[in-house]
Amino acid sequence: MKKLFITTTMCLAAFMASAQCCENSAYEVKAENAYTNYNVRYASNPQDAKHYTTDRLRKEFAIEKIFAPGEVNWTYTMFDRFLIGGAEPTTAPIKLTSLACLYTDKPTDKKRLLDNRELGIINIGGKGTVTVDGKSYDLDFQEALYVGRADEKNNKEIVLTSKDPANPAKFYMNSACAHQSFPTKKVTL
């Protein structure tokens, strides 16, 4: 009985921690030189989703805001713990920071965005630069960069900049869980 009580209490505490992290659908976290916004989407039961109205489908699945000048916008979905985001640096560089909803066990400032994650970045705007741990990668329109999982030496800091604020880079980003680190690699057409 005591073991059941402890297990139940621990499960409840974990649930409360995740609920506290994600109790509102949108958060605004001040990052260096920009705002990082994110919202959390919970997984939907396929049997329930069949009966959603058009408005409910849009609310559950459409991502309304991906790009905004000087901001990073993320959507964290419980389907595969996937992050979908966009960044549009204008006059100031944008540093990618961790999100509170990714880590409930430690303070966010002790975590990096790519702890246990990998990141793909595609530039769909003007010319821009992605700097990973001090090494710069220039990305033109439709060029991409793969950034592997962070480890003790690599992928600790990611900074995004635009070459021309009048025609800013628009970095579309996807991040998924990763269990192995691979080197950063630029991909061109």
Residue ranges and their predicted role:
Residues 133-151:
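Short acidic-glycine-tyrosine-enriched beta hairpin
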Residues 72-73, 110-111, 155-163:
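A generic local secondary-structure boundary/capping motif
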Residues 1-23:
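Bacterial Sec-dependent N-terminal signal peptides
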Residues 159-189:
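Surface-exposed beta-loop interaction hotspot
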Residues 149-156, 187-189:
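Active-site glycine-rich loop that binds ribose-phosphate moieties when present
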Residues 39-104:
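Intrinsically disordered, low-complexity, positively charged segments
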Residues 18-36:
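Sec-dependent signal peptide cleavage junction
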Residues 79-98, 104, 108-134:
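Glycine- and acidic-residue-biased ligand/ion/polar-headgroup-sensing regions
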